[in-house]
Design a protein with these regions (language model features):
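Flexible, glycine-rich phosphate/dinucleotide-binding loops
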Residues: 31, 55-57, 105, 138
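FMN-binding flavodoxin-like domain, especially the glycine-rich phosphate-binding loop
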Residues: 3-4, 14-17, 65, 74-197
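N-terminal beta1-alpha1 ligand-phosphate binding loop
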Residues: 21-43
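Hydrophobic anchor at the start of a short beta-strand
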Residues: 22, 46-49, 96, 127
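Alpha-helix C-terminal capping/helix-to-coil transition sites in glycosyltransferase folds
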Residues: 61-62
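A short, well-structured beta->alpha microelement
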Residues: 45-58
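Short glycine-/small-residue-rich Rossmann-like dinucleotide-binding loops
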Residues: 70-71
Length: 197
C-alpha cells in the first residue's frame, strides 16, 4: 500500500523542481552531531531532519541517507531503530552514510573498525561508515549523562576499546575536548558527490 504522505511529498518535489536526493538525519538536539548536520546541509544544499522515529520513514524517498549520531559506549545513538526498520523503509537500494561522532581518534584503524563492526556497518556495499571528532564539556552534561560517562571512564572504556584508544578517550573526557571541525566532513562530502556523479 502506498503512503499518501510520501506520494504527496514526491509530487511537491517534482513540481518545485527540487532534485535533492540526500537527507541528513541528526540523532541529537544539540552538540556536535547537530552542528555537523547543519554544516552538511549547508554544504550539500540538501534536506535535513532531527531524529524522530515516527517520521523516520521519510528517508525512503532519498537516494542518499546520512545518519549522524554520538558514540555512546561504542554504539551510535539511536542507530538501532534505523537498522530495525531497514527493510520496512526500503533502504536496500539506498546509499547509507553512517557517521559516528566521538572522542576517539578517527584515524585509528582499530577504533574505527570496532565501531563499524559493532554498529552493523559491514558487509554491504551501500553502507559507508565515517568517524567524526566530537566535543565534550563536562559542565554541560545532564546528571544522567554524567553518571553514565563516569562509569564508562572508570570501567567501560578499557573493556571495549584497545588500550591506546581507551587511554586517549579517557584523557580527552577528563580534560574536556573540542575536536569538532568542518573540515572533518571533507571525505564524507567527497564520497556523496562521487556516488551522485
Amino acid at each position: 500500500m502506498k503512503n499518501p504522505n510520501r506520494t504527496a511529498r514526491e509530487d511537491r518535489r517534482a513540481e518545485n523542481g527540487d532534485s535533492t536526493d540526500t537527507i541528513v538525519v541528526c540523532a541529537g538536539k544539540h552538540g556536535s552531531s547537530l552542528q555537523y548536520g547543519k554544516w552538511l546541509i549547508e554544504d550539500l544544499e540538501c534536506d535535513g531532519m532531527g531524529f524522530d522515529k515516527r517520521k523516520l520513514g521519510y528517508v525512503s524517498m532519498y537516494r542518499n541517507v546520512v545518519y549522524i549520531g554520538a558514540v555512546r559506549n561504542g554504539d551510535i545513538h539511536m542507530l538501532n531503530l534505523l537498522w530495525q526498520n531497514y527493510n520496512n523503509f526500503g533502504l536496500e537500494g539506498r546509499n547509507l552514510f553512517i557517521c559516528g561522532v566521538g572522542l576517539g581518534d578517527p584515524d585509528s584503524q582499530s577504533y574505527v573498525d570496532l565501531l563499524r563492526r559493532r554498529n552493523g556497518c559491514e558487509g554491504q556495499s551501500n553502507i559507508h561508515f565515517f568517524m567524526l571528532p566530537g566535543t565534550i564539556q563536562k559542565n554541560k552534561l545532564i546528571m544522567l549523562d554524567k553518571a553514565l560517562f563516569k562509569n564508562f571512564i572508570e570501567v567501560g572504556a578499557h573493556g571495549l576499546y584497545a588500550k591506546e584508544d581507551a587511554d586517549l578517550i579517557i584523557e580527552r573526557a577528563k580534560n574536556d575536548y573540542d575536536g569538532m571541525s568542518r573540515d572533518a566532513l571533507g571525505p564524507l562530502i567527497k564520497k556523496i558527490v562521487e556516488l551522485n556523479a
